[in-house]
Amino acid sequence: SRLHLLFAGPPDPSKHIEMAPVLAGETGIDKIYLAKKDVSSILKKILYKYRQGEKREVFPGYWIEKKGFLELAGELHKKGRNLYILDPKGEDIRTADIKEDPVFILGDHKGLPQKEFKRLKSLCNQITIGPKVYFASQVVAIVNNELDRREDKGLL
């Protein structure tokens, strides 16, 4: 599993952080232990280690580079990944056909920029988790729960 985070705000957008935590080896040498309480300090260290013009592995399994949202989505699409964008007008996640190796795209509390959202519609299937508004962390938990249910039934 990988987590992609994009930071599009000032002072120097867009930063792409890719996280593919290393699970084997000794903590502190081959890998880092990432607890919920450590997330902000780890992200701060990763952002600090950014160097213009290079994709840099800051910790084992944690990279940072300058890359925009549409560029990343395009790369994932070209690799054959199935992209899903969360949209209140999308198909309900409970009935949607979620294909193997999915990537879910969600914005912050403001949503995605309208221009990027329009372009992403051509690459992504639009899905919704329901009629209510949730925090991003809740959305991630709901999507993971739905994927777990499908995996348990052999549907993924």
Model-derived segments and spans:
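Glycine-centered small-residue hotspots that permit tight backbone geometry or close packing
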Residues: L106-G111, T128-K132
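Short, hydrophobic beta-strand segments that form beta-sheet elements in well-ordered domains
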Residues: N82-P88, F104-G107
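Structured adenosyl-cofactor binding patch, chiefly the S-adenosyl-L-methionine
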Residues: E116-L156
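Flexible, charged surface loops at secondary-structure boundaries
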Residues: E75-R81, D97-D101, S122
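Short, glycine/serine-rich, charged loops/turns that create anion-binding
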Residues: P10, G90, K110
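RNA substrate-binding interface of SAM-dependent RNA methyltransferases
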Residues: S1-I85
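Catalytic cores of processing enzymes, dominated by hydrolases/peptidases
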Residues: P88-G90, R94-D101, N144-R149, K153
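Strongly charged, low-complexity linkers/loops
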Residues: I93-D108, Q114-F117
